[in-house]
């Protein structure tokens, strides 16, 4: 028997066949056959992310070839050897950074407040980069995070600060010139007190 009736793009014939034909339809109508909604497949569990950062403070990081000198060499290898990126690090904005300010102003505020020592440095950034894109996106999605413990001077005397940002499926180290604009999407990473 063939039915050419369609209800909202569903063929009655397909439903009839799914019930097992005439016999199945009779059992269904006699309440001998129950329809049970198929369980929806569960979403795969989120991968377990490792937020524990380990930094070998005895190894100095490599700098770009345009590098001339560190502004604060005493901070180059400072900081804890191990910390939880979720709980031991905070994103910090300078006063006025909710809109747009120059990097020079952020640096001046950090120096004035004696806060540079609480900032993460390039060593930390390289260790965070090794944690991978999933960890970075979980904590810093859509942001460039700056490592003010490693402000450097180039051969022309201009100051830059390293940062981490996502590029495709990678965490990339970049450098921000202090004469550039910073916004709320460009926080400093600092160790929590």
Question: How does the language model describe each region?
Answer:
Residues 1-118, 123-193:
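A binding-site-centric feature that preferentially detects glycan-recognition modules on secreted/surface proteins
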